[in-house]
Amino acid sequence: MAAYENERLAVSTRYLASSQELEIALNDGSRHLIPVDKLEMVEETDNAFVPIAKPTDEQLSNVKVWGGGSAIYWESLEQVFRVDELMAGIYGRPEWMEKLSATISYA
């Protein structure tokens, strides 16, 4: 399937250890930073999702663009995040997003 003309795709990504953020550069020239602690990283066991152990900086540095730019992939962690969801502020399953929104304070 061909990409839509206006589809925002990742062209590069990297982990910034100093700020513990994921940087994503898109095909529209924009760059986005996402704190990695906001990303829900889980594994499926016995039909349940459980958090993975806290990843090391070395593991997080091994991130790449995947699926023609439609996803970000950590192979060693077996974690995939869709770019369109990340750009929409969706960092995990609905349950995770509810927990995240409960921790946000508005000044």
Residue positions per predicted region:
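Motif-centric detector for short Cys/His coordination patterns
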Residues: 1-107
